[in-house]
Amino acid sequence: MKKSGFIAVAAIAVFLLLGATWASALDPIPEESGFSGFVRPGVGYLKYKSNMVASIQGFDLSKEKNDDRNDSPDSETTALVTLPFNLAYTFASTRTQLFFGTDPTDLMRFDLSQQIGVKQGIGSLGILQGGFLFSGTPAKVWKDPYLEGEDRDDTKRKSTGARLVWDRIFGSFFQVQYTYRKFDIDSEKSGNSIGSLTSSDRKLLERDSDRQSVDLSYRFNFAKNHNLAPAFIYTHDDRDGKAMKNDAYDFQLTYVFLERGNPFSFTGNAYLGQADYDKRNPIYGKTQEDDRYGIQGTVYYENPWGWSLFGSRPMNFFVGGAYAKTDANIDFYDQEAIMGSVGVFFKW
């Protein structure tokens, strides 16, 4: 989040727990052979509104009982804990790196997937990366999110897929990324509780999906120690249910302040987008449209005592906050997240 709305809102929340990355730029391949990686534990507070997502990592994100399917969702508050990591081994002579772990792009989409893949330097042409994506801890959604007046049952949402990235294209700071994901909901019962719907109507609400996305971004310096990275993301979410099928268009802007010798650094991120759906929703009698936006900021501080973990670089603390919202033309699909988080970052 995909229901386009809830993915977009949850994206900012989990993105914040990680801290913003430099527009998802690939890390340079080390000059020496050996192991490298990072671990970034964090805890956070999340106030979240959704009628679609049940929980993540055992943390509840929406209420079991929905009293009126024509209303916007009530808010739910929860703590969150994350432990993103990455482990890599570099073969310096061939400019090849094998890696396994958490991809920040997937955590941004509230997916908690893992990736195993290879990164290859190709000289002046840039860096290529390919990876296989699979579910780590599947999110849980409601079997029938439209059930009224009774406790709803949840079900797992699993995913597999692949990602290709070409970064630093011809020595520039331009990056192209393509991702394919297949999403399966274990027990899909959307609309089963509504007796007036036909079997064809319920078919329109199914959420299993083949999703493709293309991300285009460019990173540049606009002043000393200040960097910007605009990005455009197009997503085609081909859901089994044509009322759930959608095309999404998002513009994202990332800002980074990083100064050598300064223990403080800052990252900020803002996005604005919309999603257009394919067919009329059989429950609400109109075709869904979403407008979504969000903003977040994270401050990092390198500890002055040189604390490290098993030979890592000096540990960094981070603290941040975020707000994100999806405003749908159907109130039931509205989404909102308010978040704060703290954590530490170790890199080898």
Region locations from a protein language model:
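Transmembrane beta-strands of outer-membrane beta-barrel pores
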Residues: 43-47, 91-93, 102-106, 132-138, ...
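Detector for outer-membrane/organellar transmembrane beta-barrel domains
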Residues: 174-177, 209-280
